[in-house]
Amino acid sequence: MAQVFLGMSGGVDSSAAAVLLQAQGYAVSGLHLSLLSGLPLPADRLPDDGSDARAVASLLGLPFYDMDLSPEFRATVIDYFIREYEAGHTPNPCVFCNRRIKFGAMWDAARKLGADYLATGHYAKIRQDPATGRHLLCRGADRSKDQSYFLCRLTQEQLSRTLFPLGDLEKPAVRALAEAHGLINAQKRDSQDICFVPDGDYVSFITRCVGHESPTGPFVDREGRVLGQHKGFIRYTKGQHKGLDLAIEPPLYVLRKDPADHAVYLGHNEDLFTSELIAGDWNWISIPALTAPMTVTVKTRYSQREAEAVAEPLSGGQVRLRFREPQRAVTPGQFVVLYDGDAVVGDGVILE
């Protein structure tokens, strides 16, 4: 019987995944990750999901392990998060965490305990292309919950030993399954925030981590005129309008940031639209590499509606995307994910 270690967050999704895996005949063990030990978080802001995960595992008769990967999380995800903001970028820590921690360090731990597969409660699918043998990452059946964007950095090796039991289900069916099996978290609210910034105040979090306030600097318009002083370099992201505290009409928006002098450049809404981007650090999934222009659909952030584009290979492993229609606030540091139908072609980090 194949041994599956299931990442259990304490939420309804991973708990329902345990029920499905048991029904499919796997020997299932629960594995809960503690990631936030030692971080400068107020005690009342620390999530306590481990108790729910343990209770569900007990109800279902699963062996259960609670593993503290806080040092690894701090050294990879948190350091990346801070470094990217200080460089003037807007990071996506969940994408980074999935590859390095949840499907990296957690798998390493599970393998030492005898795991054949790692499973999670993500809404996505994995299938193997019969023609190429490559493992494909595909969108989940519930398009409103699809998490393929956040899983875009997974490698072929990681995909080959991963199971997503919820891929064919929609959220109401998942809750109904949990209710039918008497799971205590069947109606538990979905988490919406970055786990280490539960109140959404990433500026205060970074300030506590680094021990000082973010540098101030000038607001500058497109003509190079200084419009005033901002309150801290990391407080602003491309496309932002609220919080500028500038009484100027028509309204101004953040266009870009320069870490050299901590300047924040402002312009009008129409200045935010672009017809192309360049991205690097690519992770290819459905293909080994991009060698010729390819028509794809694109997401430059999770909440974005997909846009049609042509992907063109450049030198040095970079790719240019030319959009059919201009896109707003394409932000350096974010991940751009390419789709061919429901399958993820690959992803890169937006450079410009």
Across the structure, where does each feature detected by a protein language model lie?
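AMP-forming adenylation/ATP pyrophosphatase catalytic core
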Residues: 119-126, 130-352
